[in-house]
Amino acid sequence: MSKYNILNFKDLPVVKRGKGVESVGLIRKELGSKVFSSGITNIPSGVSIPLHSHNVVEQITILEGRGVAEVEGKVYEVETFDTTFIRGGIDHRFINTSDSVLKILWIYASTDVTRTYTETGETVPQLTESEYDNK
C-alpha cells in the first residue's frame, strides 16, 4: 500500500444515486484509510436527498450553492462553507433550494459507513449499488 495517493477527480468513478444526484468517493478503505472516508456529492436544483442517518459521525461542508439542512426535524439555511457536524443515529438530509447545483463535501469518522433510511428503516452500506435507487 502506498504511503500517499494523489486523486485526480476527473478520473474517479461517479455514483449516480437517482434524481440527478451524483457522488464521488475520495478517501476510502480501498486506498488504505483506516480512520475516515470522504467524498463529494452534487445535488441538482430542487432536489432533496432522503431523510437518513449514519452509524458514525459525519461532517458536511457546503462547497458550492445554497440550500436547507434538515436535522432532527429542524430546518437550517446553509450556503458555501457552512459546515455541519452530525453524530451517528441522527436523522438528516439536504435540500437544494437554489437555481444551481448544491455541492457538498462529506467526511465520515470511519471507513465502514452505513446509511439507514428514516422512512423504511432499511440500512445499506454507503456508496454501494443497493443505495442507488430513489428512496
Predicted segment positions?
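A short hydrophobic beta-strand segment most commonly corresponding to one strand
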Residues: 59, 85, 100-115
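Short, charged/polar surface micro-motifs in flexible loops or helix N-caps
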Residues: 31-34, 44-47, 66, 110-113
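Short beta-strand His + acidic residue motifs that chelate non-heme Fe in jelly-roll/DSBH
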Residues: 50-51, 69-70, 86, 92-98
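Glycine- and acidic-residue-biased ligand/ion/polar-headgroup-sensing regions
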Residues: 57-58, 62-67, 72
